[in-house]
A protein has these predicted regions:
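N-terminal positively charged helical leader segments and presequences
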Residues: 1-55, 87-90, 94-103, 107
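RNA substrate-binding interface of SAM-dependent RNA methyltransferases
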Residues: 2-15, 32-35, 76-87, 116-203
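Short, acidic/turn-prone active-site loops that include or flank metal/cofactor-
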Residues: 18-20, 46-47, 154-156, 223-225, ...
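Short, hinge-like loop/turn segments at secondary-structure boundaries
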Residues: 30-32, 58-60, 165-169, 213-217
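Short beta->alpha connector loops at strand-helix junctions that form conserved
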Residues: 43-44, 126, 152-153, 175, ...
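Acidic/glycine-rich phosphate/pyrophosphate-binding loops and surrounding catalytic core
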Residues: 53-55, 59-60, 64-80, 116-117, ...
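Structured adenosyl-cofactor binding patch, chiefly the S-adenosyl-L-methionine
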Residues: 140-144, 158, 163-171, 229-268
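Active-site/ligand-binding-proximal alpha/beta "capping" segment
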Residues: 198-246, 251
Length: 268
């Protein structure tokens, strides 16, 4: 993940003495020294272990400055976006060698001309508490071309180390923002012509019966309690994911993926 960090946002890169000795070609290729003489710092293995939050650190970590964005920035974005996130700095203590394949996501506009601009596809998350869930959602969001993720202020910290690792580098490229008033944020989306759907047990229609080719937002609630009544009332429509057996609900990340990729399918 460190190798994927936008170089213009790198504040500091720390490597252990062992990592430096074993990865000279990698460090030469990354050329961190060109960013400034103080960017790269080599520390002893013992110091690096104390700096890390994992028992077997890989020997490289970074401090990356993230740009702040507004909800306005999430409408009609280019598919090949740079990461712009709603908080400042983050310690990134993860693998430098992760890589992911990317598809050509170019779309055609209504005139038939080639365009990279897509209709807004947003995720609105309320009070998610599991770092792994949030990280999985961010990673999925990049693959699906989600234009932004809006989170309530009581959602787990996106910069939780477990969350960062779960994103597998997607955190650099998916715009995310925390808001103090999630209902107000939904109102802003609706004012921009975004239709808001809530995944809800009281949904009367199956999720695949709606039109998501238009500007769309999906609301996903807390793992145990779902969406609050206050936020549910802001939805234009409630949809449900049909299930069999005694299962009443799905994992938040799974539900989010099902809904989002239905929108992707419709937009192909």
């Amino acid at each position: 993940m460190v190798s994927e960090a936008p170089k213009d946002r790198l504040v500091k890169v720390y490597v252990s003495e062992t990592f430096k000795a074993d990865n000279e070609e990698f460090l030469k290729k990354m050329n961190y020294e060109a960013l400034g003489k103080d960017i790269l710092e080599v520390v002893s293995d013992n110091v690096f272990v104390r700096m890390s939050d994992t028992q077997t650190p890989q020997g490289i970590m970074a401090v990356v400055k993230m740009s702040e964005i507004t909800i306005e920035d999430m409408f009609g974005r280019d598919m090949h976006i740079n990461s712009m996130n709603g908080k400042n700095d983050v310690n990134n203590n993860t693998d430098s060698n992760n890589a992911a394949s990317k598809d050509d996501n170019s779309k055609n506009d209504n005139s038939g001309n080639s365009s990279n601009t897509i209709q807004p596809l947003l995720l609105i998350l309320e009070n998610l508490q599991d770092p792994g869930n949030l990280g999985t959602i961010v990673r999925m969001a990049e693959g699906a071309g989600v234009t932004g993720i809006i989170m309530s202020s009581n959602t787990v910290d996106i910069y939780n180390p477990k969350t960062i690792r779960s994103t597998m580098g997607s955190l650099y490229r998916v715009p995310v923002i925390y808001v103090d008033d999630i209902c107000k944020a939904v109102d802003e989306c609706k004012e921009k012509g975004v239709k808001v759907y809530a995944a809800h047990l009281k949904g009367t229609d199956n999720y695949n019966q709606k039109d998501y080719a238009q500007p769309t937002a999906f609301m996903i609630g807390n793992e145990g309690n779902g969406l609050s009544d206050r936020l549910t009332q802001k939805a234009d429509e409630l949809v449900r994911i049909p299930m069999q057996g005694k299962v009443e609900s799905l994992n938040a990340a799974i539900a989010c993926t099902i809904l989002t990729y239905e929108a992707v399918r419709q937009r192909l």
